[in-house]
């Protein structure tokens, strides 16, 4: 299992314009601090488990509107932001790992986690060995970082660029309105 942070302003660090130009305007939504966290996991047989999406704040109306069938959505306290903590990890284990990994897979499975302090040694799923990657080594060892997450982020960036190009709604400060959670979930 690995968490990825999806920033809602995926502004590129490169621009294209005439050489020597001192100011290049960039269209953005001024939402640099707005982000969601998605926990992804693949079973030992290569099957993708349901994603676990963390939004900050409350969202009871959002869940009623969307009714996502292939996704588990949780809302976190504002102080936590949309980061995984021990309680949310326990919910992930119960709602996704224990529910989706059948008994045959569990007897032979290990759960590989990055060395995240918020979940370290706090809770582990039933019938599963949990191993933590050494600190600062996940970019070399974590299978999800090396494959699935990179592809997911790349596809989201393409979607975001298309959305920004076609979105003409602006705020009173003349910024493009940021992508809402409904748009994000429907696309995902």
Language model regions located:
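RecA-like helicase/translocase P-loop NTPase motor core
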Residues: 1-188
